[in-house]
Protein backbone atom coordinates (compact mmCIF):
# COMPACT_ATOMS: atom_id res chain seq x y z
CA UNK A 1 0.00 0.00 0.00
CA UNK A 2 1.51 3.32 -1.08
CA UNK A 3 2.14 5.94 1.59
CA UNK A 4 -0.64 8.56 1.56
CA UNK A 5 0.53 12.16 1.48
CA UNK A 6 -1.91 15.02 1.98
CA UNK A 7 -0.85 17.96 -0.21
CA UNK A 8 -2.30 21.20 1.17
CA UNK A 9 -1.60 23.92 -1.41
CA UNK A 10 -3.91 26.60 -2.80
CA UNK A 11 -1.98 27.22 -6.04
CA UNK A 12 -3.25 24.59 -8.49
CA UNK A 13 -0.13 24.44 -10.75
CA UNK A 14 2.15 23.81 -7.76
CA UNK A 15 -0.27 21.32 -6.20
CA UNK A 16 -0.62 19.38 -9.44
CA UNK A 17 3.15 19.32 -10.00
CA UNK A 18 3.80 18.08 -6.46
CA UNK A 19 1.15 15.37 -6.82
CA UNK A 20 2.70 14.25 -10.11
CA UNK A 21 6.16 14.02 -8.54
CA UNK A 22 4.78 12.06 -5.59
CA UNK A 23 2.96 9.59 -7.85
CA UNK A 24 6.12 9.08 -9.91
CA UNK A 25 7.93 8.14 -6.70
CA UNK A 26 5.39 5.62 -5.47
CA UNK A 27 3.35 7.79 -3.10
CA UNK A 28 -0.42 8.28 -3.07
CA UNK A 29 -1.16 12.03 -3.02
CA UNK A 30 -4.41 13.43 -1.67
CA UNK A 31 -5.21 17.06 -2.54
CA UNK A 32 -6.58 19.93 -0.48
CA UNK A 33 -6.79 23.49 -1.80
CA UNK A 34 -7.71 25.38 1.38
CA UNK A 35 -7.83 25.10 5.17
CA UNK A 36 -11.32 23.61 5.43
CA UNK A 37 -10.78 20.96 2.77
CA UNK A 38 -7.51 19.99 4.48
CA UNK A 39 -9.31 19.50 7.80
CA UNK A 40 -11.97 17.42 6.01
CA UNK A 41 -9.24 15.08 4.73
CA UNK A 42 -8.23 14.18 8.29
CA UNK A 43 -9.98 10.84 8.49
CA UNK A 44 -9.33 7.17 7.83
CA UNK A 45 -7.30 6.10 6.01
CA UNK A 46 -5.07 8.69 7.68
CA UNK A 47 -2.31 10.45 5.74
CA UNK A 48 1.19 9.20 6.49
CA UNK A 49 2.61 12.70 5.98
CA UNK A 50 1.29 16.19 5.23
CA UNK A 51 2.87 18.70 2.82
CA UNK A 52 1.59 22.04 4.02
CA UNK A 53 1.63 25.56 2.60
CA UNK A 54 1.74 28.44 5.07
CA UNK A 55 -0.79 30.81 3.48
CA UNK A 56 -4.15 29.17 2.78
CA UNK A 57 -7.68 30.39 2.10
CA UNK A 58 -9.63 30.07 5.33
CA UNK A 59 -6.67 29.76 7.67
CA UNK A 60 -2.91 29.37 7.93
CA UNK A 61 -0.56 26.42 7.92
CA UNK A 62 0.43 27.31 11.48
CA UNK A 63 -3.21 27.10 12.57
CA UNK A 64 -3.53 23.75 10.81
CA UNK A 65 -0.51 22.32 12.65
CA UNK A 66 -1.97 23.47 15.96
CA UNK A 67 -5.23 21.73 15.01
CA UNK A 68 -3.29 18.52 14.29
CA UNK A 69 -1.44 18.61 17.60
CA UNK A 70 -4.65 19.06 19.61
CA UNK A 71 -6.14 15.79 18.35
CA UNK A 72 -4.83 12.42 19.56
CA UNK A 73 -5.49 10.78 16.18
CA UNK A 74 -3.47 13.32 14.19
CA UNK A 75 -0.78 14.68 16.50
CA UNK A 76 1.76 12.08 15.33
CA UNK A 77 1.33 12.70 11.59
CA UNK A 78 4.58 14.27 10.32
CA UNK A 79 4.33 17.66 8.60
CA UNK A 80 6.63 19.21 6.00
CA UNK A 81 5.96 22.88 5.34
CA UNK A 82 6.30 23.90 1.70
CA UNK A 83 6.13 27.67 1.46
CA UNK A 84 7.49 30.85 -0.08
CA UNK A 85 8.13 32.28 3.40
CA UNK A 86 11.86 31.73 3.68
CA UNK A 87 12.89 34.13 6.45
CA UNK A 88 14.70 32.58 9.39
CA UNK A 89 12.01 33.65 11.86
CA UNK A 90 9.35 31.97 9.69
CA UNK A 91 11.32 28.72 9.53
CA UNK A 92 11.87 28.78 13.29
CA UNK A 93 8.19 29.48 13.96
CA UNK A 94 7.09 26.65 11.68
CA UNK A 95 9.45 24.14 13.27
CA UNK A 96 8.65 25.24 16.82
CA UNK A 97 4.92 24.93 16.12
CA UNK A 98 5.41 21.29 15.18
CA UNK A 99 6.56 20.99 11.56
CA UNK A 100 9.13 18.23 11.03
CA UNK A 101 10.84 19.96 8.10
CA UNK A 102 10.60 23.24 6.20
CA UNK A 103 11.14 23.66 2.45
CA UNK A 104 11.08 27.05 0.73
CA UNK A 105 9.76 27.72 -2.78
CA UNK A 106 11.05 27.39 -5.43
CA UNK A 107 12.23 23.88 -4.66
CA UNK A 108 13.80 20.89 -6.38
CA UNK A 109 11.42 17.94 -6.87
CA UNK A 110 14.29 15.55 -6.10
CA UNK A 111 15.06 17.37 -2.87
CA UNK A 112 11.37 17.37 -1.95
CA UNK A 113 11.15 13.58 -2.31
CA UNK A 114 14.45 13.09 -0.47
CA UNK A 115 13.26 15.23 2.44
CA UNK A 116 9.93 13.39 2.61
CA UNK A 117 11.73 10.05 2.79
CA UNK A 118 14.14 11.40 5.40
CA UNK A 119 11.27 12.59 7.61
CA UNK A 120 9.51 9.25 7.29
CA UNK A 121 12.70 7.39 8.23
CA UNK A 122 13.18 9.64 11.23
CA UNK A 123 9.56 9.43 12.40
CA UNK A 124 9.05 5.75 11.55
CA UNK A 125 12.32 3.82 11.75
CA UNK A 126 10.23 0.63 11.51
CA UNK A 127 9.91 1.39 7.78
CA UNK A 128 13.20 -0.39 7.05
CA UNK A 129 12.17 -3.63 8.77
CA UNK A 130 11.01 -6.87 7.20
CA UNK A 131 7.46 -8.18 6.91
CA UNK A 132 6.13 -9.69 10.15
CA UNK A 133 3.75 -12.66 9.94
CA UNK A 134 1.66 -14.40 12.61
CA UNK A 135 -1.11 -16.92 11.87
CA UNK A 136 -2.11 -15.44 8.53
CA UNK A 137 -1.75 -11.84 9.69
CA UNK A 138 1.09 -9.94 8.04
CA UNK A 139 2.40 -6.42 8.58
CA UNK A 140 4.76 -4.76 6.11
CA UNK A 141 6.49 -1.74 7.75
CA UNK A 142 7.88 -0.56 4.42
CA UNK A 143 4.58 -0.28 2.56
CA UNK A 144 2.41 0.19 5.68
CA UNK A 145 0.26 -2.70 4.47
CA UNK A 146 -1.55 -5.08 6.84
CA UNK A 147 -3.01 -8.24 5.34
CA UNK A 148 -5.27 -10.99 6.65
CA UNK A 149 -4.27 -13.68 4.19
CA UNK A 150 -4.82 -11.99 0.82
CA UNK A 151 -7.27 -9.43 2.22
CA UNK A 152 -5.91 -5.92 2.95
CA UNK A 153 -6.94 -4.39 6.27
CA UNK A 154 -7.44 -0.66 6.75
CA UNK A 155 -6.35 1.09 9.94
CA UNK A 156 -5.07 4.44 11.14
CA UNK A 157 -1.38 5.27 11.77
CA UNK A 158 -1.68 4.88 15.54
CA UNK A 159 -3.36 1.48 15.21
CA UNK A 160 -0.62 0.47 12.77
CA UNK A 161 2.10 1.44 15.26
CA UNK A 162 0.26 -0.34 18.05
CA UNK A 163 -0.08 -3.51 15.96
CA UNK A 164 3.59 -3.31 14.95
CA UNK A 165 4.61 -3.13 18.60
CA UNK A 166 2.35 -6.03 19.55
CA UNK A 167 3.57 -8.24 16.69
CA UNK A 168 7.20 -7.62 17.61
CA UNK A 169 6.49 -8.25 21.31
CA UNK A 170 4.00 -11.15 21.39
CA UNK A 171 2.90 -13.19 24.41
CA UNK A 172 3.79 -10.44 26.88
CA UNK A 173 1.45 -8.36 29.02
CA UNK A 174 1.82 -4.57 28.86
CA UNK A 175 0.10 -2.01 31.04
CA UNK A 176 -1.53 1.05 29.50
CA UNK A 177 1.37 3.18 30.73
CA UNK A 178 3.92 0.86 29.11
CA UNK A 179 2.03 0.93 25.81
CA UNK A 180 1.86 4.73 25.95
CA UNK A 181 5.62 4.93 26.46
CA UNK A 182 6.46 2.41 23.74
CA UNK A 183 3.94 3.47 21.07
CA UNK A 184 3.26 7.17 21.74
CA UNK A 185 6.61 8.06 23.32
CA UNK A 186 7.54 9.54 26.68
CA UNK A 187 7.41 13.17 25.53
CA UNK A 188 3.71 13.18 24.62
CA UNK A 189 0.95 13.63 27.18
CA UNK A 190 -1.87 11.18 26.48
CA UNK A 191 -4.40 9.86 28.99
CA UNK A 192 -4.25 6.15 29.82
CA UNK A 193 -7.79 5.59 28.53
CA UNK A 194 -6.64 6.71 25.08
CA UNK A 195 -5.00 3.29 24.82
CA UNK A 196 -8.40 1.62 25.27
CA UNK A 197 -9.84 3.68 22.41
CA UNK A 198 -7.09 2.61 20.02
CA UNK A 199 -7.26 -1.00 21.19
CA UNK A 200 -10.97 -1.02 20.25
CA UNK A 201 -10.17 0.48 16.84
CA UNK A 202 -7.38 -2.03 16.29
CA UNK A 203 -9.67 -4.94 17.13
CA UNK A 204 -12.32 -3.62 14.76
CA UNK A 205 -9.72 -3.34 11.99
CA UNK A 206 -8.61 -6.94 12.61
CA UNK A 207 -12.14 -8.39 12.68
CA UNK A 208 -12.43 -9.31 8.96
CA UNK A 209 -9.77 -12.01 9.32
CA UNK A 210 -10.72 -13.04 12.84
CA UNK A 211 -7.44 -11.73 14.23
CA UNK A 212 -9.12 -9.41 16.73
CA UNK A 213 -8.96 -12.32 19.20
CA UNK A 214 -5.18 -11.94 19.25
CA UNK A 215 -5.50 -8.60 21.08
CA UNK A 216 -6.36 -9.84 24.55
CA UNK A 217 -7.35 -7.97 27.70
CA UNK A 218 -5.62 -9.08 30.90
CA UNK A 219 -7.86 -7.87 33.71
CA UNK A 220 -6.24 -5.50 36.16
CA UNK A 221 -3.00 -5.44 34.17
CA UNK A 222 -3.30 -4.38 30.55
CA UNK A 223 -3.14 -6.03 27.14
CA UNK A 224 -1.38 -8.94 25.47
CA UNK A 225 -0.98 -9.97 21.82
CA UNK A 226 -1.18 -13.74 21.61
CA UNK A 227 -1.85 -16.60 19.20
CA UNK A 228 -3.21 -18.66 22.09
CA UNK A 229 -6.96 -18.16 22.32
Swiss-Prot record:
PROSITE patterns with a match to the protein in the record: OMPR_PHOB, RESPONSE_REGULATORY
Subcellular location: Cytoplasm
GO BP of this protein: phosphate ion transport; regulation of DNA-templated transcription; regulation of DNA-templated transcription initiation
A GO CC term assigned to this protein in UniProt: protein-DNA complex
Domain of life: Bacteria
Gene3D superfamilies reported in the protein's UniProt record: 3.40.50.2300, 6.10.250.690, Winged helix-like DNA-binding domain superfamily/Winged helix DNA-binding domain
InterPro entries in the cross-refs: CheY-like_superfamily, OmpR/PhoB-type_DNA-bd, Sig_transdc_resp-reg_PhoB, Sig_transdc_resp-reg_receiver, WalR-like, WH-like_DNA-bd_sf
SUPFAM superfamilies: CheY-like
Entry comment on modification after translation: Phosphorylated by PhoR or CreC.
Pfam family for this entry, one: Trans_reg_C
UniProt DNA-binding region: 129-227
Residues recorded with modification 4-aspartylphosphate: 53
GO MF, one example: transcription cis-regulatory region binding
Domain Response regulatory: 4-120
Free-text function comment from the UniProt entry: This protein is a positive regulator for the phosphate regulon. Transcription of this operon is positively regulated by PhoB and PhoR when phosphate is limited.
Protein name: Phosphate regulon transcriptional regulatory protein PhoB
Source organism of the structure: Escherichia coli (strain K12)
